[in-house]
Regions:
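Extended extracellular/luminal ectodomain segments enriched in beta-structured repeat modules
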Residues: 32-42, 121-123
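PGST-rich, cysteine-poor low-complexity/disordered linker and tail segments that act as flexible spacers
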Residues: 149-180
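Short amphipathic, basic-aromatic surface patches that mediate peripheral association
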Residues: 42-53
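Boundary/junction segments of secreted and surface-exposed precursor proteins
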Residues: 1-18
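Hydrophobic residues on conserved beta-strands that form the core of alpha/beta folds
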Residues: 26, 38-40, 113
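Short beta-strands within extracellular/lumenal beta-sheet-rich domains
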Residues: 18-33, 109-111
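Aromatic- and Gly/Pro-enriched, solvent-exposed loop/edge beta-strand patches characteristic
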Residues: 53-157
Length: 180
């Protein structure tokens, strides 16, 4: 995002994360110093849309949350592995912004959400939820993946991500091979 300067940016190698429709997932980020009024937000996704049902328009919806929810005790601070009782991170809580659904484009694409105009706290979680794809089988022609990875240029982010489904929020490390 930017007003007078970039408050978070990362360059990346490709790391794709696929989740079933109805699951939000995204990155917790610590924003750079200075004003944190975000006007624009961009994220990258990859989608395969060749077998999407006729008349269906697959979409992505961006949400930005303050990390002011309950304390999450699911990561052990000593080992940085999920399942520990000592991590103490705050879960995403207050919804600060929700975009209109953006129509997906096949292949790799950068999606820009403009006219946000929200003041952000120092730590937020941004998520994307896909709709109109099933994500059951990569290569099925009806999947979408959020691109998560990177070297932080401005601000910072750990090697983990938040997932929200019907059971609530869970934190996973990017290197973890098992998600619920």
């Amino acid at each position: 995002g930017q007003i007078g300067g970039v408050i978070y940016n990362s360059t990346h190698t490709t790391y794709e994360a696929y989740f079933k429709t109805g699951t939000e997932f995204g990155d917790e980020i610590d924003l750079g110093v200075g004003g944190r009024r975000v006007s624009e937000f961009a994220f990258e996704a990859y989608s395969e849309l060749s077998n999407v049902a006729s008349g269906t328009t697959p979409t992505a919806t961006l949400k930005i949350y303050a990390n002011d929810g309950a304390t999450y005790d699911g990561v052990d601070i000593g080992t940085q592995q999920t399942g520990g009782a000592n991590y103490g991170a705050k879960m995403p809580g207050t919804l600060l912004f929700k975009s209109d659904a953006k129509a997906l484009v096949a292949g790799f694409h950068t999606y820009r959400v403009t006219d946000i105009n929200v003041d952000l706290p120092a730590k937020v979680t941004w998520t994307v939820e896909f709709d109109g794809v099933d994500n059951d089988t990569v290569g099925s022609g009806k999947t979408a993946a959020l691109i998560l990875a990177g070297t932080d240029d401005v601000g910072s982010s750990l090697d983990d991500f938040w997932q929200k489904d019907a059971s609530g929020w869970k934190l996973y490390r990017s290197g973890s091979t098992v998600q619920d």
